[in-house]
């Protein structure tokens, strides 16, 4: 796997709030995409640009058991 960009605050917020714009999981929040789908992108190639970076970061977060981080961010967004 290529070097994953270090998620910044805006990336983490986008992972929690942005929906997949196309494909099998169109309309699904990025944070809710199954690992198998993200792994498929890892094998086939992530989309270029911000979406690809977000998907790659989402996979890394899930693979490293850091999903609680996304839960906390989501709670903070809802609380505002």
Question: Which residues make up each language-model segment?
Answer:
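DEDD superfamily 3′-5′ metal-dependent exonuclease/proofreading module
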Residues: 1-80
